[in-house]
Amino acid sequence: MLSNTLIIACLLVIGTTIALIAVQKASSKTGIKQKSYQPSIIIAGPQNSGKTSLLTLLTTDSVRPTVVSQEPLSAADYDGSGVTLVDFPGHVKLRYKLSDYLKTRAKFVKGLIFMVDSTVDPKKLTTTAEFLVDILSITESSCENGIDILIACNKSELFTARPPSKIKDALESEIQKVIERRKKSLNEVERKINEEDYAENTLDVLQSTDGFKFANLEASVVAFEGSINKRKISQWREWIDEKL
């Protein structure tokens, strides 16, 4: 009897241990699948457009000289909203950091502020347009309604600044050229069929029969002028408040 009782007790211990291990593994897998992120608003754009200055002004109500950063800067729980502001570096070689972020967290992004320098010659917007195409290719294909974008036209106080409508039109025209060049490149370069189809499909998402237009995107895209140095960012603040 004693030996039988001992055997049964051992079997119960072994069975319980196996069950606990199974539960832990299941919990671990579930945790990974259900991983969530804090909602965020992204600040992006070319170098020297005022991204970090905007983050500083929004979070400290002060204007300070900026330092070039190679890593994203963030401010959690902006204005007590539970939303994190994330400023991404604008250097061409570091733009992949934003792409990686969007590919994993697009559904948690409540809006994207794309900073531009209002004084830049429209003829020199090629790299800016390429950056926007990279962003839109992800946001428009990853989210049912895209991610709303504010084109924040900084340095509007300067004499050479152009109005937001002109900047928006120039970007539309340049983005269309970027899309055409990339499609042509895809047709000329031999690639794996699945990779080529994916790249072409993401570009098709951005085009309609009349070419590229911000108005035809799933997301809303607006352009407002402002000046960080003059602390005139009321329109930008209103847009942010709507997203919180």
Curated annotation (Swiss-Prot):
InterPro entries in the cross-refs: P-loop_NTPase, SRP_receptor_beta_su
Organism listed in the record: Saccharomyces cerevisiae (strain ATCC 204508 / S288c) (Baker's yeast)
One GO process term, biological-process aspect: SRP-dependent cotranslational protein targeting to membrane, signal sequence recognition
Keyword Lyase part of the UniProt annotation: no
Similarity comment text for this entry: Belongs to the SRP receptor beta subunit family.
Pfam families: SRPRB (PF09439)
Keyword Amino-acid biosynthesis: no
Residues spanning the membrane: 7-23
A GO-annotated cellular component: endoplasmic reticulum membrane
Source species taxonomy: Eukaryota, Fungi, Dikarya, Ascomycota, Saccharomycotina
Keywords recorded for this protein, A-Z: Endoplasmic reticulum, GTP-binding, Membrane, Nucleotide-binding, Receptor, Transmembrane, Transmembrane helix
Remarks, miscellaneous: Present with 8250 molecules/cell in log phase SD medium.
Subcellular locations according to the entry: Endoplasmic reticulum membrane
Name used for this protein in its record: Signal recognition particle receptor subunit beta
One example GO MF annotation: identical protein binding
Residues that bind GTP: 45-53, 66-69, 90, 154-157
Function comment: Component of the signal recognition particle (SRP) complex receptor (SR). Ensures, in conjunction with the SRP complex, the correct targeting of the nascent secretory proteins to the endoplasmic reticulum membrane system. May mediate the membrane association of SR.
Membrane topology per record: Single-pass membrane protein
Domain of life: Eukaryota
Quaternary structure note: Heterodimer of an alpha and a beta chain.
